[in-house]
Amino acid sequence: MAKRIIGTTPKEDGFRMPGEFEAQDQIFMIWPERPDNWRDGAKPVQIAFTNVAKAISRFTPVTMLVSQSQYQNARYQLPADVRVLEVSNNDSWVRDCGPSFVINDKGELRANDWTFNAWGGLVDGLYFPWDQDDLVAQKVCELERVDSYRTDDFVLEGGSFHVDGQGTVLTTEMCLLSEGRNPHMSKEDIENKLKEHLNAEKILWLGDGIDPEETNGHVDDVACFVAPGEVACIYTEDEKSPFYEAAQDAYKRLNQMTDAKGRQLKVHKLTCPAKNVTIKKQFRIDTVEGTMPREDGDICIASYMNFLITNKGVIVPQYGDENDALALKQVQEMFPDREIVGVNTVEVVYGGGNIHCITQQQPKAK
């Protein structure tokens, strides 16, 4: 049985969210199918999701959540070592609607179940309804028999922050201070909420993300912790890049920051793609009222930063771009003791996200 914990917070109970670079038990994903977000009835992106799941499963068990109508299709496409479970959903962004797990020193596992409103609710959310997505975290906790903390008064997505597991949280002002999330809360209120639910002492604020139209600037496209005291940050000197200003600002800010332990951050540069990834007019994407349209020429958020660290591996986006190999080399330098695996995820980018967005790790508690 999985219960809701009322009246206390993870910090009060001695739980913390570990860094992504710490040991993991499994990775959750959600099978894509929306024809108003994914081109050609989601068939191309289902291949990409399958390839991502295969890459992850070399290092960590994968559980794929799938709707009733897609269960048999997903089970057929995915390898036998990927567990497939039927769970209703509105779309496939488990990083944002799934649970953010926390652990304690006794080897126990719990989770944060954030309120999810499709990245902005009725202000600037990407689709409606989102009610099934908002239940995903609770259902995962039931499946895993994990007690959870529900934040009915606080909207948050897992892709909007990174933690180092040692008291530091990295996020962006563009996202967490956006009107469609928690307009009733001050910046200080939001900081306190993060500190209580992630067991943190210090919040590091970047300015803008690189996807204002999608998620209001999630940090996982811009920067992440790669080890205690070390971060990676996207970097480009190409002033024509749509990511230039945000990348330069983030890099400058990070180089001036210290973490919760007082360490000056070591900042690793990660290249941006040489060419923009864009929506093509021949893509067959359904138009549905209430869903953000994807139109010819739209620039997609193709960032190498949206990788997943999972046990002895790091799964890195690839785009068929001339900078693909450089990105893999740079990530390998950040993680000399891990295997770096590139997966072409351009089909995922067409739908507004990438590898980190479509995965959620369950840390090893013991």
From Swiss-Prot:
Documented EC number(s): 3.5.3.12
Active site residues of this protein: 357
Top class in the EC scheme: hydrolase
Keywords: Hydrolase
Superkingdom in the source lineage: Bacteria
One term of GO molecular function: agmatine deiminase activity
Biological-process GO terms, alphabetical: putrescine biosynthetic process
SS bond partners: none
Residues in coiled coil: none
Catalytic activity reported: agmatine + H2O = N-carbamoylputrescine + NH4(+)
Keyword Hydrolase on entry: yes
Sequence similarity: Belongs to the agmatine deiminase family.
Protein name listed in UniProt: Putative agmatine deiminase
